[in-house]
Amino acid sequence: MHLKRALITLSLITLPIIPFSSYAVESINNTGSMESPASVAADSTSNKQDESWWQRSKHNLSATWNTSQSHDIYIPAITWHNRWTYDKEKTDKYNERPWGAGYGVSRLDQDGDWHGLYIMAFKDSFNKWEPIGGYGYEKRWRPTHDQDFQLGLGFTAGFTMRDNWNYIPIPVLLPLASISYSKLSFQATYIPGTYNNGNVFFAWFRWQI
């Protein structure tokens, strides 16, 4: 019951982020000048496109939650700090064994692409607990005759909370990639950053039950 409530909450707070992952929001003209017919037509088209993305996002979240095809167990596997962007004395102190676990629900759509809602907790670089949860999408490819073998590429949008940020919810929008066979997937993301900050590869196993 607690997991279900958590996933519902994450679905609601993640929803506003997803449309912005696929297009940039156009600036609003506040000059007060009269718009040309072409400008009005362009704004109308933009509004319809915005509504289309918004409706699609709501549909994907609703369908994933209400018509999920599997329940998933998440097992964090590795965090790796990019050695080309860190001083050695820092990486020597960081934890790269993200012990933890997670739970989620997922489905494949009519195109065979993956959608998932998840919540996971793991030990971060400072060996402190870090929860993360949200929505994930992957375009799936099946490069061989064996349809159980799949490659995925997409994004995840959601929220995380860290000890060094006083566990304030932080929105995240990150790339997502995977290699899957049957019910087992190895998924990964890369957190970009600056020198001695960010630039972390994070991966986990996902098992459909």
From Swiss-Prot:
**What is the designated name of this protein?**
Lipid A acyltransferase PagP
Which UniProt keywords are given for this protein, alphabetically ordered? Acyltransferase, Cell outer membrane, Membrane, Signal, Transferase
Organism of origin: Pectobacterium parmentieri (strain WPP163)
Which residues are annotated as site, described as Role in the phospholipid gating?
Y195
Q: Name one GO biological process term.
A: lipid A biosynthetic process
Indicate where this protein is primarily found: membrane
- Report which superkingdom the organism of origin falls in: Bacteria
Q: Does the keyword Hydrolase apply?
A: no
Assembly, per entry? Homodimer.
Q: Which family does it belong to?
A: Belongs to the lipid A palmitoyltransferase family.
Q: Which Gene3D superfamilies match?
A: 2.40.160.20
Signal peptide segment: 1-24
Molecular function in Gene Ontology: acyltransferase activity
